[in-house]
A protein has these predicted regions:
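Solvent-exposed flexible segments
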Residues: 208, 222-235
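Hydrophobic lipid-interacting interfaces of membrane-associated proteins
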Residues: 181, 233, 284-286
């Protein structure tokens, strides 16, 4: 509504000012450039240490009953005698989880027994039983809060071995085993009620190697044994709902893993009690997957895909029917991964 010079009123319609051309096209020559502003990334969420305890339990169950041929004692046992054996082992592992936010320290104890049920010439078939326990402590590097995890497991399995040479001191060998395990798991945070859930695994392993006699003396010999082992683990865990409503499911772990190494050992040729020392070096290649989902968010353990192992120990032959062995091993990997273990075993021919 506009009043003109004669005092008359009338309506006027007109366009307003257009948009700023520098807003429409900042590249125009008359426009002053504006420095871009980097987007602000939200800080990573602070996680409860209980998440690391669930992941530690999963890792412990996967590796508790991992089995190699030499875990059943020395190959150098000629004849058609069947053998019964037993071994105890203990290990300590340190690794991180969820991008290094959580520190995991765990110990595992194992008892495994077995016996040949069929032995003929260069081949044997047997059964084995195992029982183990793992305890872990998880501390948040951000808050300092902690949680604990525990796994109790049992396993049953079968194994079979064939060697080109009857006493296993020359030529090729093939070893295989199948195992089935069940685990009772427990997780507890500070001031919280314990959480219980079940898991299970099925594993298959195939190992092969070749033994070379590199030195022969009058009463002893030295051997080099390259080894290759492939293993597959199918791991399953029950869907679990915590008392606070958190849902833990979609366990993704296990899969195919491999081991490539060499074992150097001495072997006495004299009768009676004989000590046979050995050294071993291994490259361990894992599946690289160890995750769980917490309310739909996937979290993982920082267990390296590549690990490197050193072994040392000795086997003691006690006459014709008894033998014992013991050894230690150290594994190292990225992200501060460390695993130190040892075992003792006893073997009897019958």
């Amino acid at each position: 509504l506009v009043k003109d010079a004669n005092g008359n009123w009338y309506l006027r319609s007109q366009t307003g000012a257009g948009p700023d051309p520098c807003v429409v096209d900042p590249s125009l020559p008359e426009c002053v450039p504006i420095d871009p502003v980097d987007p602000v990334e939200p800080p990573p969420p602070v996680l409860r240490p209980e998440a690391g305890a669930y992941l530690a339990n999963q890792s412990a169950a996967l590796n508790m009953f991992a089995h190699r041929m030499h875990d059943r004692g020395p190959m150098t046992a000629p004849g058609d005698d069947r053998h019964a054996w037993a071994r105890v082992g203990r290990g300590n592992v340190d690794f991180s989880a969820v991008g290094g936010q959580l520190a995991v320290d765990g110990t595992t104890s194992l008892l495994q027994i077995g016996s040949d049920v069929l032995r003929t010439g260069n081949a044997s078939v047997g059964v084995m039983l195992g029982s183990g326990r793992a305890d872990s402590s998880v501390v948040s590097r951000v808050t300092g809060y902690s949680a604990k995890g525990r796994v109790r497991g049992t396993a049953v399995g079968v194994y079979g071995t064939w060697s080109q040479d009857a006493d296993g001191t020359q030529g090729a060998y093939i070893d295989a085993n199948l195992q089935f395990g069940r685990f009772d798991n427990r997780v507890q945070g500070i001031g919280l009620e314990p959480e219980h859930y079940d898991s299970r695994m099925a594993s298959a392993s195939l190992e092969t190697g070749y033994t070379f006699n590199v030195w022969q003396g009058t009463a002893s010999a030295l051997y080099v044994q390259p080894q290759l082992q492939l293993s597959h683990v199918d791991f399953r865990a029950d869907r679990h709902v915590e008392s606070n409503g958190t849902v833990i499911d979609h366990a993704d772990a296990g899969g195919l893993s491999g081991r490539l190494g060499v074992r150097v050992f001495g072997h006495g040729t004299a009768a009676g009690n004989t000590v046979q020392p050995y050294l071993g070096v291994n490259w361990l290649r894992g599946s690289g997957t160890s995750t769980l989902q917490f309310n739909g968010d996937t979290l993982g353990a920082d267990v390296p895909r590549n690990r490197y192992e050193m072994q040392a120990g000795a086997e003691l032959k006690l006459g014709q029917r008894w033998g014992t062995w013991g050894g230690v091993s150290v594994q190292r990997g990225d992200h501060g991964y460390r695993n130190v273990g040892g075992q003792l075993g006893l073997r009897m021919a019958w």
